[in-house]
């Protein structure tokens, strides 16, 4: 099968969306499918003012249709609600092409944190964005319930797997850190509200595993915590 994936989030960004679709593409390719990505690196981009790490495509509108018609995919999936995702969504809707979408980030809450835009307003936009999708793929039952409560239907649970070759139980390693250890594993970025955790006066050691745009700043500010990358 020929599968087209459109995503506004891509390398060199470090986040769950990029990792998810990299892994998915590699797995599909290993099974004999042909996977093509429409991502920001194929276009002229500008940095998002409130989050410079995120690059937004600006010259993609007239190229999207050419890419789709040339590739002739059997399936089209829109991973994000950004400029590229919007362009692919609109092209598919206009030309009666079936497509699926994903809801990977709590976008309304994220935008509210970064730019103070009301959550209710963003949910209305998301409802419009996903209304023509054949299926809206989400990671958990709680997110399904949340989206359904805002009128976003045709939600399907798509859980994330774990590469058991890369991640598997090993013998305990003595980190020589004061006990107890409070562990965070994930992206190091503003929307994770990690400062609420790092400010806590706790006996023991705060240990953070992961990377992201806020790592250097937080590592410098909270010297009592251990950042292992």
Regions inferred by a protein language model and the residue ranges of each:
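Nucleotide-sugar donor-binding and catalytic loop/hinge architecture
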Residues: 1, 169-181
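N-terminal subdomain of nucleotide-sugar transferases
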Residues: 1-43, 71
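Active-site proximal beta-strand in glycosyltransferases
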Residues: 3, 75, 92-110, 137
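Short N-terminal targeting/anchoring amphipathic segment
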Residues: 64-85, 94-100
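Nucleotide-sugar donor phosphate/pyrophosphate-binding loop at the beta->alpha transition
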Residues: 98-100, 109-128, 138, 164
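Donor nucleotide-sugar binding/catalytic pocket of nucleotide-sugar-dependent glycosyltransferases
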Residues: 123-170
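Conserved donor-binding/catalytic core segment of Leloir-type glycosyltransferases
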Residues: 176-207
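Nucleotide-activated donor-binding/catalytic signature segment of Leloir-type glycosyltransferases, i.e.
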Residues: 215-229
């Amino acid at each position: 099968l020929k599968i087209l994936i459109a995503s506004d989030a891509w390398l060199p960004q470090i986040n769950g969306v990029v990792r998810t679709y990299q892994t998915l593409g590699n797995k599909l390719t290993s099974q004999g499918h042909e996977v093509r990505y429409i991502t920001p690196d194929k276009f002229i981009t500008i940095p998002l003012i409130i989050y410079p790490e995120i690059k937004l495509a600006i010259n993609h509108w007239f190229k999207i249709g050419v890419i789709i018609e040339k590739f002739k995919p059997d399936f089209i999936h829109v991973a994000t609600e950004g400029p590229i995702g919007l362009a692919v969504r609109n092209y598919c809707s206009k030309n009666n092409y079936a497509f699926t979408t994903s809801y990977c980030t709590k976008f309304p809450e994220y935008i509210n944190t970064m730019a103070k835009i009301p959550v209710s307003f963003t949910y209305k936009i998301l409802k419009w964005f996903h209304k023509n999708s054949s299926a809206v793929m989400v990671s958990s039952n709680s997110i399904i319930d949340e989206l359904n409560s805002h009128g976003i239907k045709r939600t399907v649970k798509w859980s994330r797997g774990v590469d058991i070759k890369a991640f598997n139980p090993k013998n305990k390693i003595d980190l020589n850190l004061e006990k107890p250890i409070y562990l965070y594993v994930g992206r190091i970025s503003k929307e994770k509200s990690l400062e609420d955790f790092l400010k806590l006066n706790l006996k023991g050691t705060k240990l953070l595993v992961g990377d992201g745009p806020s790592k250097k700043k937080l590592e410098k500010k909270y010297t009592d915590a251990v950042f292992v990358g």
